[in-house]
Amino acid sequence: MKYVLDVHTHTVASGHAYTTLLENAKYASEIGLKVLGTTEHGPKMPHAPHIWYFYNYKVLPRKIYGVTMLHGCEVNVVDYKGNLDLPEDIVKDLDIVIASLHEPCVTPGTIEENTAAILNVMDNPYVDIIGHPGNPAYPINAEEVVKKAKEKNILIEINNSSFKTSRIGSVPNCTEIVKLCKKHGVNIILGSDSHVCFTIGNFDKIQEILDSIDMPKELIINTDEKKLLTYLKSKGKLKDLVID
């Protein structure tokens, strides 16, 4: 299956990634991606960018090397109430927002607490994607999360790095989540979570799961850039962007 976008990527600005914005955009162009999202870690992650970094996205062009660039953040959920580590006046102006649970930012809790954190963050109108919800460090009630995602029109991310270098043990959880998304008709978005340009657009391990359960193409956002851009525009974002 051909995928044309990857919106979960990091640059050197995140502190533990290895390539620049231009290097990422150039690589995305070379492999034929049409949309690239830069979603740096929120400020509570050690060595993440200062909040001014996110304010200043406005200086960046919408296209680099012919690739449509989305300027966003992987915000950190900082408590079980679903609060984030970026103020609303910044979050509301980002092109795309992924909300994730990370151990340096919120202590893993019980299934009920972890689930509450995700359910609560989905009430935030500026959150677009739940990042790597299959992380075994944060066990959740996946069915509740998927049902809430459908109710709130939130995308569920399946994260390729969860099967390679991070969050070891995610395969069973992610498989269950994909099955539930298929059952309930919830859109998923594939993310590379690249911290170096060479993994951008690589969803090889995710593809094995998708093939094993015959996931409908219609529920995979990455197959058509218009699916994503239309979705974001429906939430009041990307006001400057004209969809061809």
From Swiss-Prot:
Belongs to the PHP family. GO terms for molecular function: phosphatase activity; zinc ion binding. This is Probable phosphatase NT01CX_1282. Its cofactor is Zn(2+). InterPro entries: Phosphatase_YcdX_put, PHP_phosphatase, Pol/His_phosphatase_N, Pol/histidinol_Pase-like. Zn(2+) 1 binds at H8, H10, E74, D193. It comes from the Bacteria. It comes from Clostridium novyi (strain NT). GO terms for cellular component: cytosol. Its EC number is 3.1.3.-. Zn(2+) 2 binds at H16, H41, H195. Zn(2+) 3 binds at E74, H102, H132. The keyword Phosphoprotein does not apply. Binds 3 Zn(2+) ions per subunit. It is an enzyme of class 3 (hydrolase). Keywords: Hydrolase, Metal-binding, Zinc. SMART domains: POLIIIAc.
